[in-house]
Amino acid sequence: MSFPSRTRFFDPGSSAGGGEVTLVSMAPNGEVSGLRTALAMGAAKAILVSDPALAGTDALGTAKVLAAAIRRAEPDLILAATESSDGYTGTTPVQIAELLGLPSVTFAKKVEVTGSSVKVERQTEAGYDEVECPLPAVVTVTAGVVEPRYPSFKGIMAAKSKPVENLTVADLGIDAGQVGAAGARQEITDVAPAEARAAGEIVVDEGEGHLRVIEFLEQLKVL
C-alpha cells in the first residue's frame, strides 16, 4: 500500500483541502507494525483483517476481503499502490473497484480532487493521459506521486492511541470457503530463485573493439 501518498494527499494542512485517512490492510498474525507506521504519518484510524482462514488467499480472494472492509469505511476516494511487493499481480485494486461497483483509474502520477470528481494524470508508455471520473472511485498510484514523508516523534507517540479495528472473515460476513486456499482460483506450485546472471564481457578497445561489439549484436540477432 502507498501510505505516504494517502497521508500527504489528505494532510489537513496541505493544499489538497484536508480530509481523513482510514487505512485498510489484510495481514497474517495480527501484524500491525506497518499500520502503526502509517498512523504515525498522519492517518486517523485503521482497519486490519487478520484470520487463519485467509492463508493461501489469491488476488480475487484478497479483493473480496478488502472490498468488504473498505465498504465499512464508506470512503470518498480509495487509493492503493499499483501492485503489492509480494504477489505483484497488479489486479487487486481493479478487482476491488469491480466488487464495489466503482470506477477505477490505474498508474496515477498525479491526483487532484475537484468537487465530486477526481482528475488523474495516468502514466503511459508514451507519456500520460488526463482522466477524470466521478467519486467515489479507486485510484492506483505510482511510486513518484508524492515525495516520501517520514513519521515524526510526535506522530509516533500519537499513533499508539489511534484506533485499529481488528476484523475476521466472519465479521465481514464472508464465507470462509470463498477465501484462503479453499476459495483460491490460483495456486502457487513452485517458488524458485532467479537464475544467476553470467558476468558480462569487458571489451578492451585497442582499435578494433567495435568489431567485437558488432559480433556480439549479430549473435543477439539485433543486426
Regions found by a protein language model. Give the residues of each.
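N-terminal glycine-rich FAD/FM-binding segment characteristic of electron-transfer flavoproteins
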Residues: 1-223
